[in-house]
């Protein structure tokens, strides 16, 4: 039986995440997780991965919509962003792109990624 995005968000601590966009993509299959903080993240991603990030690399990206398109093409199943240290909030450009791409985008509450 495949594990889906809608399944992993029922598990703590992901159950504390807030869905920002891409609700229609919650049936995407999850194979593994990846934590990345580099601008060219798509070269490190595999189909079915869930991407976790604190947004450090977003400061170097001019077009966050294009970033979302690249990771969606790489086959990412969902994106979890942890605002706080590098971002005050998930940028609107990412939210709009995720909705258009049907790519689930979540905001994580204040917690360490080690708990994932």
Task: Mark where each language-model region is.
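Alpha-helical/coil-rich non-catalytic "connector" segments in signaling and regulatory proteins
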Residues: 1-114
